[in-house]
Amino acid sequence: MRASGVVLVVLIFGHLFVNLFAGEGVKAIDFAFVAGKLADPFWVVWDTLLLWLALIHGGNGMRTLVNDYAPNPRVRVVLLVAIAASTAVLITLGTLVIYTFDPCPAGAAAELLPSFCPVP
């Protein structure tokens, strides 16, 4: 938890700096901005690490709370299974979104697309 927490601090502040302070700030965040970021392998890896570490870190924290405050063994098992299942589902869906995102979807308005997409 300590190591993932330190890495998460770096990933989160890097994410916030790039999205909110660099360039035009929060006003520049639109589909083209996100598409441009997810077209770059560096940001794909960055966002994947951020997703995985945040969910595993949070799931482990919730596991610790359940172990400390759920005295009934049956309730504890149900809660731990729910935490593990929800963490696994969110990691799977989030990873699918990151790796299957199409920055140049067919039929999208040209003004919403990033500059590297071919104009129809």
Show where each model-derived region lies.
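Membrane-embedded alpha-helical bundles that constitute the cytochrome b-like, heme-associated redox core
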Residues: 1-120
